[in-house]
Amino acid sequence: MNPHDTIPIVPAPRHDAMPDVRALVAYLEQDPQPMIVVDPDYRILAANDAYRRQFGVAGVEHVGRHCFQVSHHYDVPCDQAGEHCPMKQALESRGLNRVLHIHHTPRGPEHVDVELRPIFDADGNVIAYVERLTTVRSASAQPSAEGLVGGADAFNAALGALQRVAPSMLPVLLLGESGTGKELFARALHEASDRAMGPFVVVDCSGIAETLFESELFGYEKGAFTGANQRKPGLVETAQGGTLFLDEIGDVPLPMQVKLLRLIESGTFRRVGGVEALRADFRLVAATHKPLREMIDDGRFRQDLYYRINAFPIPLPALRERRGDVALLAESILRRIANARASAGDAGARPFVLTERALVCLDAYAWPGNIRELRNVLERACLFADDGTIRIEHLPAELVVASAVRQEGAGDARGVSDAELVRIARTFDGTRKALAEQVGMSERTLYRRMKALGLGTREV
């Protein structure tokens, strides 16, 4: 079944109309993707085998339960818990709605792309909804030794945009401060696209001298200049059939911006010293931390090039905007450090761990250098943590002082730290009410705290 096919009208799948539900499920079984049928009261009426295999739990029957209980462990619908509810939006628009959520699964929390479509009766009334669920492989909501990692609302917004644009050929412009993970996002975009089997070629626009830029990008013919003893393909040619990632495109010299624009507009290029126009075949992804619009006003960046690369901009959040993600990222980075040590021949390499005080300190810091700064801090701390435990004294003194100032400024005597609440919420298997009782606060206070942390209350 194609995701854009119109779902045929069927009799209302009431709880007492099992033959109709079974007929709909038989239709859904043709789809290899996990799918469920949900009634207007959020109750799961049926699920296909693909859903049971991927999201089912042995001994637990999902049919008959509310979808928000199964997927989120909520005791209220998503929109009442501070989340975007695709069912509510689909009812208002009377059409397909799509959203990226974090669902509880047998493997732990996972990013899931939810596509929901209403089913109408002969009178035009919505009688049920069909949900198609696709696990997002390009990012992890759990600690991971590779790839994108995150669970905060700001991160999920960027990931959701990435998932939507990945199947297309639109040029993508990643916008964000230094250290926010632009290359990781670009690579994830490539791997989620139809060109995933092709090359992913990175062009560091800030690291190539202006005099070498053209030959590096387009290559050169034998004899094109002194020292050109043989033909050399450029990075554009190397990216054939794949993705060309222009990192820090704001650093491209003005004379080269003209040639880059011609490449994008015509889809052709010439090697330096060559006369033959060669056909380019790549998906363009660019990134910058610079204010390109201001650079256009100052005459430092071409407006026509800007509109070519800015077809689908994706703002990437700074780490300080990803409340609740510091602990997740820290554990992921520590795993990567351990893996690197093991690969280097350290047979006893194992993941380092952070004390609660150290984690609270990291969580309170503003991280002007973003994830890159967090990685540097942890790599340094690992060199001092002889027993594998990173304590607050292993962190840079200026970071500890800055964190203390921020914590004092918050005037917060809440008992449970943000870092501790994030950790508990992400491992808690129960309702929000039960979690509130465990951490000793009201459910309303818990909701407000989790919302401020960027969790959107979805972790329970």
What are these regions (language model features)?
Residues A158, T180, V203, L217, ...:
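Conserved RecA-like P-loop NTPase ATPase core
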Residues V57, R195-G198, G273-R283, P291-S403, ...:
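Nucleotide-binding/hydrolysis machinery
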Residues H15-F55, P167:
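Sensory modules in modular signal-transduction proteins
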Residues A161-G227, E237-P253, A318-G324, V377:
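Conserved post-Walker A coupling segment in P-loop NTPases
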Residues V60, R65-G108:
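Terminal output helix/cap of sensory domains in signal transduction proteins
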Residues M1-P19, A47, R52-F55, H104, ...:
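Bacterial C-terminal helix-turn-helix
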Residues H101, V114-L116:
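Compact sensory input modules in signal-transduction proteins
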Residues P118-N156:
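Sensory coupling linkers of modular signal transduction proteins
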